[in-house]
Curated annotation (Swiss-Prot):
Chain positions found as N6-acetyllysine: 147, 212, 401, 434
Name under which the protein is recorded: Elongation factor 1-gamma
Residue(s) carrying N-acetylalanine: 2
Native source species: Homo sapiens
Residue list for modification N6-malonyllysine: 434
Domain GST C-terminal intervals: 88-216
Amino acid sequence: MAAGTLYTYPENWRAFKALIAAQYSGAQVRVLSAPPHFHFGQTNRTPEFLRKFPAGKVPAFEGDDGFCVFESNAIAYYVSNEELRGSTPEAAAQVVQWVSFADSDIVPPASTWVFPTLGIMHHNKQATENAKEEVRRILGLLDAYLKTRTFLVGERVTLADITVVCTLLWLYKQVLEPSFRQAFPNTNRWFLTCINQPQFRAVLGEVKLCEKMAQFDAKKFAETQPKKDTPRKEKGSREEKQKPQAERKEEKKAAAPAPEEEMDECEQALAAEPKAKDPFAHLPKSTFVLDEFKRKYSNEDTLSVALPYFWEHFDKDGWSLWYSEYRFPEELTQTFMSCNLITGMFQRLDKLRKNAFASVILFGTNNSSSISGVWVFRGQELAFPLSPDWQVDYESYTWRKLDPGSEETQTLVREYFSWEGAFQHVGKAFNQGKIFK
């Protein structure tokens, strides 16, 4: 039976996974989450900690036997028993399936929606609306799956349930008000069943579900940001005023910078994340302003204004055009589910919006449909390999680079951007389209 120490910061939902698993398996897990034993942002940056956990991330687990492991899913797996991991190869595969689904499909939109309401991330209206729709899709998917099931895998709680519940936790506590969640009775029933298990309650306590959807509070956001002490301006003495300007500048340079206020654990967790590098920073500047085209596309007529603007200003050296097709049309069944594939991909590519535009269309009807689209990317190569966050979906599509000067490209851009035309290359009728902008 596993025994050891879990390093984390207080109320870390990722750490909850291992702690709940330990409640089921009987693993002896001690938690160090506060000074003087563990100070997040300091202890996890010491040479001693980094020798054991090179990434410097928490949660991190150190066994009494010296075994060390980081990443919350790996820790939860280690402290689990066979029943939680899946007692057959098939059950184990399904557990991994749902654990992976939680990380890839639930975490991104949940963070985008919830973090601004906690004052730890700035609010972006469009991103939040996209996140809401993605959460709605996820809850619907779970609701359909759980219609005839008590738990996600088998008839008992597994790591699948523990992981997905913990990933949904802040959604249910912060933003899923009754009017939003009432459409998903099976998901709600399963969530409540899990959090009321003694093993869950021992870690989570009593979970109070959201009564009114929390909103972004600009004042709260400003208050949670690190501030610098700014000394009050005082009238200088006569002697001070008489000092040469150069001397006064030197004194200001020598003055120690104002110390920052100490951040709370949540802010420290975010601050500890490595600063994201711009994947397109290596590209030369371009004359084509994508945001201006997007404004034209959103507010003006597509055929008479937006498209002429696009071709007049498109920089073929700084940008590229691509045609994509979904590789597995035989797997597409209900059109609403096919549409969810597109929406899910767009959500996971949220940080690419500044450097991309696309029109992706669903053609056909239930059990006879296809998905294809035209994309605009910064640079001359596909953008997806530039960031691991963007690589979840793109391999499910074929990609063909288009020649901006060809008649075929002109036709494809016109038809896909306007959602009008013969679409002769498809062989199916237009059903609906979605714009990535």
